[in-house]
């Protein structure tokens, strides 16, 4: 029985397809892992959240060939390892309200699975109450094997050949020197805000940075920015019972040609806030020449509910 119009249009197969899970994960991983420095940042944050007192970052070829981060933190139980490699698997939050009570650097549960999706990754981890550890081997987001292994307490994550399965993205990475600089920036930012942790940074077998643990933020600042810089810093403190600020800012006697040495932290998380940058630079406007900027390290501590963390995949 006809109705005067062609029904074949409604029977045509759809051109829209739901992507396979591994393809979707690889695309999503590109938002979290932009370059080797993203891996360094995510793995260092995981190590810090694991209550580590020592963290070592080792790179080869600016992180293009190899990134290895190992710590002496809490480690993971064998049964937790495959779970940690799934997206949105995290021990940091359980419900939306927990976003207002976060005390850790990581919370989205995307670091390990995202890194695994775009590299060849090996994890070795062991908890204190176990005589042996667990080793997981992943390639392109697929777990190739999980086995028992001898290793110290803590976690070691080795990432090789980043973006080997995304050649176009790898092509747009910069030179080894540039990628190394990006990695160092994240290393120094995290090292600066966690003086009670010892850090090492090794590139192509050469120790570039070694920071001993200390309870003094000023000692860590000196280790990173230099003794001469520290002698030209003034201390500022503020505490109203809810918000606490500890700041170190340069005297007009020294300045920089860029804002690279302005470090702002909220609850030990490095942030870039235009209003704070503008306020700092405005303070120095009448004492520094045009095009010159101060050195400033600002640590702000607030209740977790006072600031909403950026929950995007590409959060920095």
Task: State the predicted function of each range.
Residues 1-5:
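Low-complexity, intrinsically disordered Ser/Thr/Pro- and acidic-rich segments
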Residues 314-316:
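Positively charged, low-complexity/disordered segments
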Residues 8-9:
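Short, positively charged and aromatic/hydrophobic N-terminal segments
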Residues 12-308, 312:
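N-terminal phosphate-binding caps/lids of nucleotide- and nucleic-acid-binding domains
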């Amino acid at each position: 029985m006809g109705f005067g119009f062609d029904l074949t249009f409604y029977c045509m197969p759809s051109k829209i397809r739901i992507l396979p899970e591994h393809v979707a994960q690889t695309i999503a991983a590109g938002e979290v892992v932009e370059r080797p420095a993203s891996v360094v940042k995510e793995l260092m944050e995981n190590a810090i959240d694991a209550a580590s007192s020592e963290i070592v970052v080792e790179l080869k070829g600016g992180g293009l060939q190899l990134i290895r981060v190992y710590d002496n933190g809490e480690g993971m139980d064998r049964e937790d390892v495959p779970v940690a490699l799934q997206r949105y698997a995290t021990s940091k939050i359980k419900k939306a309200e927990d976003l207002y009570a976060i005390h850790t650097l990581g919370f989205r549960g995307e670091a390990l699975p995202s890194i695994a999706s775009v590299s060849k990754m090996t994890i070795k981890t062991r908890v204190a109450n176990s005589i042996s550890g667990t080793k997981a081997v992943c390639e392109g987001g697929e777990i190739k094997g999980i086995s028992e292994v001898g290793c110290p307490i803590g976690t070691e994550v080795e990432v090789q050949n980043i973006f080997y399965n995304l050649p176009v993205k790898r092509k747009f990475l910069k030179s080894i020197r540039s990628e190394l600089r990006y990695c160092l920036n994240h290393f120094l930012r995290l090292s600066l805000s966690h003086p009670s942790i010892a850090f090492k940074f090794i590139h192509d077998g050469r120790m570039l940075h070694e920071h001993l643990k200390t309870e003094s933020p000023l000692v860590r600042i000196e280790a990173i920015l230099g003794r001469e810089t520290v002698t030209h810093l003034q201390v500022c403190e503020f505490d109203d019972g809810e918000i606490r600020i500890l700041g170190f800012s340069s005297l007009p006697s020294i300045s920089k040609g860029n804002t690279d040495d302005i470090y702002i932290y909220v609850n030990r998380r490095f942030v870039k806030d235009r209003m704070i940058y503008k306020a700092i630079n405005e303070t120095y406007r009448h004492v520094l020449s045009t095009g010159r900027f101060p050195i400033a390290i600002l640590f702000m501590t607030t209740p977790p509910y006072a600031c909403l963390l950026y929950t995007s995949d590409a959060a920095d």
